[in-house]
Amino acid sequence: MLLAIDMGNTQTAMGLFDGDELVQSWRMPTDRSYTADEIHVRLMGFFKMYGLSLDAVDAIAFAGVVPQLSREWHAVADRIAADAIVIGPQTAAVTKLRAARPQAVGADRVANAVAAETFYGAPAIVVDFGTATNIDVIDEDGYYIGGAIAPGIRISMDALAARAAKLASVPLEAPEHAIGRDTEECIKVGAVVGAAAMAEGLVARMKRELGREDATVIATGGLAGIVADSTDAFDMVDGQLTIKGICEIYRRMQKLGVKQGHKPSTPDATAPQTFAKPIPQN
């Protein structure tokens, strides 16, 4: 089985795949202080809770934005005798990239682009509501061409509470109205409906620039469900899009016969890693 890992700045999403089938998924906080011991214990707890065996995992594929945790995850893979594959923009099996600096495209965005094209077709626009709100565009030929990055909803709310003396933290949930009736509801409107309106506006502009009003729009990320209640801009909400993309990249690597392996003693904790040849750029 494959354990797909999406290491975000705030949460780490995991999915266990048997072939192409997603058997189980879960999330845990991303803590940069975690050691391999702590990660291993947490994994064993999740697997036990769902009646699964960690021994069944023969490969772990990573896509993440927290490189300092890569060494610890490699050590966990070593303990359970699983291959460790680091997904990145230059991994041989990923979707085609036409970004100005392909090597700088985040691994999570690459995975989202692969999943969007594979499961929903091209052209497509992915809106990922996480620590940051990422919008990624795949053109009609299946190329990732760029997008946008904005502060995430939680970051915005935390900054507001920290810098505005009379505005406290409020629960993150979709408001019932677009006009807030009190201070707490006004903050929710600004955060959630504001994020929805931003997505609507950017998606509309991107569709026009792309010249394809029919581009499929997919929302994903931990907060996608909350925002989706406040807009009709999304054709699909898929909270598992990133880990499905990681699985698809791993599957393609297997088909291509790309040699995989883990090197727990040597990974550079300051830079993304790949174990495959880069895609030739046109």
Residue ranges of model-derived segments:
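Conserved phosphate-binding catalytic cores of ATP/NTP-utilizing and phosphoryl-transfer enzymes
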Residues: 93-124, 247-255
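Short beta-strand-loop/turn "lid" adjacent to the catalytic site in phosphate-handling enzymes
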Residues: 50-105, 141-147, 152, 181-192, ...
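Short beta-strand scaffold segments in enzyme catalytic cores
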Residues: 12-16, 126, 133-138
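Short glycine-rich, Thr/Ser-proximal phosphate-binding strand/loop in the N-terminal lobe
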Residues: 2-48, 142-168, 174-177, 185
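Phosphate/pyrophosphate-binding loops at sites that engage ATP/ADP/AMP, CoA/4′-phosphopantetheine
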Residues: 43-58, 202-214
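ATP-binding/phosphotransfer module of carbohydrate and carboxylate kinases, centering on a glycine-rich
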Residues: 2-4, 30, 156-282
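Short glycine-aspartate micro-motif
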Residues: 2-6, 59-61, 124-128, 218
